């Protein structure tokens, strides 16, 4: 289960049981990259599991494949979280719920503001989930406006990002599968229509108002 951008999010099963993202499957992986909701000061990540056998195998893989020092049972990597990053994350962890709540408040303000225009489709949160808004990403109804909006906002001093502009099936690394443009039309359509606006725990009202004002101004021309 990939929870690189979803740490702290909830998922509610049909029986009413609610669990955290990353604990639904046999194992869940998350990222502690500095920009994440729970970020370290350098690279880092974690895998969560209740399976003792799997946990032992994972600990071995991330430590050069060693079952004990100098004895390599498998091919592994050096993926050990250093003590500095662990100490930072231990302190920040107690603030995670507050971080996520702050992001949700920023997202709700965006959603309310952009509901006033027909040009934007805001993020949807299903009733059985919660959203932690690692990114605030909207869809434009008119894909031809996306790059124009990105350039316009930059000219006004408003950062916006087009994340993951090339879908996996069109990446050179996966070209051996033989997929071509048009094979995954919905994916390609979404890649052409999404754009992300600033969101973080320390965002001030004046900053967000300025962003909203300029986004809406673009669509008023």
Segments from the language model and where they lie:
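Glycine-centered loop/turn positions within well-structured domains
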Residues: 19, 36, 134
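PLP-dependent aminotransferase class I/II
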Residues: 6, 10-16, 50-221
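Residue-level micro-sites within transmembrane alpha helices that shape
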Residues: 1, 25, 35-36, 42, ...
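Active-site PLP attachment segment
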Residues: 23-59, 66, 86
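Conserved PLP phosphate-binding loop immediately N-terminal to the Schiff-base lysine helix
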Residues: 1-31
């Amino acid at each position: 289960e990939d929870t690189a951008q979803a740490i702290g999010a909830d998922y509610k099963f049909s029986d009413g049981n609610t669990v955290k993202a990353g604990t639904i499957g046999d194992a869940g992986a998350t990222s502690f990259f500095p920009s994440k909701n729970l970020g370290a000061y350098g690279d880092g990540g974690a895998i969560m599991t209740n399976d003792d056998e799997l946990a032992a195998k994972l600990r071995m893989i991330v430590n050069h494949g060693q079952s004990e020092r100098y004895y390599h049972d498998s091919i592994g990597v050096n993926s050990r979280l250093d003590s500095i990053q662990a100490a930072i994350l231990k302190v920040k962890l107690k603030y995670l719920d507050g971080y996520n709540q702050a992001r949700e408040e920023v997202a709700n303000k965006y959603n309310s503001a952009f509901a006033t225009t027909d040009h934007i489709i805001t993020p949807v949160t299903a009733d059985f989930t919660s959203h932690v808004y690692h990114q605030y990403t909207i869809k434009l109804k008119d894909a031809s406006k996306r790059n124009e909006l990105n350039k316009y906002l930059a000219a006004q001093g408003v950062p916006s990002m087009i994340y993951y502009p090339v879908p996996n099936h069109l990446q050179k690394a996966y070209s051996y599968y033989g997929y071509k443009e048009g094979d995954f039309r919905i994916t390609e359509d979404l890649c052409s229509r999404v754009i992300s606006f600033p969101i973080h725990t320390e965002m001030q009202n004046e900053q967000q108002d300025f962003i909203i004002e300029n986004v809406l101004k673009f669509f008023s021309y």
